[in-house]
């Protein structure tokens, strides 16, 4: 059980990083520091962006549950 949670944690950690990097910069914050503040002529959210947001939230939820699971298993081992 602990091994499965640890594998899930590693996989979801990598997925969260990749999914966050796939998002377009929305301006402001630290993204403008690295040139992410340039806006394209297409403003607004597309279906792809909305689905990417949903997928990111879903994977982040799994990541959070696996972190709590690993912490509880470590504490009560």
Swiss-Prot record:
Topological category with respect to the lipid bilayer: Multi-pass membrane protein
Disulphide linkage map: none
Transmembrane segments: 3-23, 55-75
An annotated Gene Ontology molecular function: protein-transporting ATPase activity
Protein family per UniProt: Belongs to the SecG family.
Function: Involved in protein export. Participates in an early event of protein translocation.
Name of the protein in question: Probable protein-export membrane protein SecG
């Amino acid at each position: 059980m602990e091994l499965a949670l640890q594998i899930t944690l590693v996989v979801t950690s990598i997925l969260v990083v990749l999914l966050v990097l796939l998002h377009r910069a929305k301006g402001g914050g630290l993204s403008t520091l690295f040139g992410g503040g340039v806006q394209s002529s297409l403003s607004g959210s597309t279906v792809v962006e909305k689905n990417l947001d949903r997928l990111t939230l879903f994977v982040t939820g799994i990541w959070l549950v696996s972190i709590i699971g690993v912490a509880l298993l470590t504490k009560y081992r």
